[in-house]
Amino acid sequence: MAQFSESVDVPDMGRRQFMNLLTFGTVTGVALGALYPVVNYFIPPAAGGAGGGTTAKDELGNDVSVSKFLESHNVGDRTLVQGLKGDPTYIVVESKEAITDYGINAVCTHLGCVVPWNAAENKFKCPCHGSQYDATGKVVRGPAPKSLALSHAKTENDKIVLTSWTETDFRTGEEPWWS
């Protein structure tokens, strides 16, 4: 029978082993930090609330306050916000007290360029290939084959909430192509 002493000496960690562990920890931390945004890219965003809507965001990513929005915009103004699926969406000021009940998706139906509002000509004009849309987003001149997509815009707790438009397109009388 072998006798074991109670005080078993554990050898100290050598300098080389310590440096290896330190290097491994550093490389692992940097690699995980670099992989985090890549992994997040492939994870879909969380679903909207019970209403399925998306709160409109300004250019800084803050929720758009309806009262402040109406104070700083004139009747008839069309202003870009971040809307459904992160798409740029125009909010239209209907009166000093209200916005229209719809938002206009600013992505051109031809090749996907963002279509700016031209207030002087009272229409949207695509800078890529010249497509033109009227004040409601209905296509009036190609090469764009379809009108700009719509979304419902409503006010909840002083915020603009955008929801999917699934009803008949009031501009064309047809079923919406985007739903």
From Swiss-Prot:
Which key words are in the record? 2Fe-2S, Disulfide bond, Electron transport, Iron, Iron-sulfur, Membrane, Metal-binding, Thylakoid, Translocase, Transmembrane, Transmembrane helix, Transport
Location comes to:
Cellular thylakoid membrane
Do you know which InterPro entries this protein is assigned to? Cyt_b6_f_Rieske, Rieske_2Fe-2S, Rieske_2Fe-2S_sf, Rieske_Fe-S_prot, Rieske_Fe-S_prot_C
- Where it mainly occurs, coarsely classed, is membrane
Q: Which residues bind [2Fe-2S] cluster?
A: C108, H110, C126, H129
> Which residue intervals define the domain Rieske in the entry?
61-162
Tell me if Thylakoid is a UniProt keyword of this record. Answer: yes
One GO term in the molecular function aspect is:
oxidoreductase activity, acting on paired donors, with incorporation or reduction of molecular oxygen
Which membrane topology describes this protein?
Single-pass membrane protein
Q: Which GO terms describe its biological process?
A: photosynthesis
The cysteines joined by S-S bonds are C113-C128
- E.C. code: 7.1.1.6
Job of this protein: Component of the cytochrome b6-f complex, which mediates electron transfer between photosystem II (PSII) and photosystem I (PSI), cyclic electron flow around PSI, and state transitions.
Q: What is this protein called?
A: Cytochrome b6-f complex iron-sulfur subunit 1
What organism does the UniProt record list as the source? Nostoc sp. (strain PCC 7120 / SAG 25.82 / UTEX 2576)
Its organism's taxonomic lineage begins at: Bacteria, Bacillati, Cyanobacteriota, Cyanophyceae, Nostocales
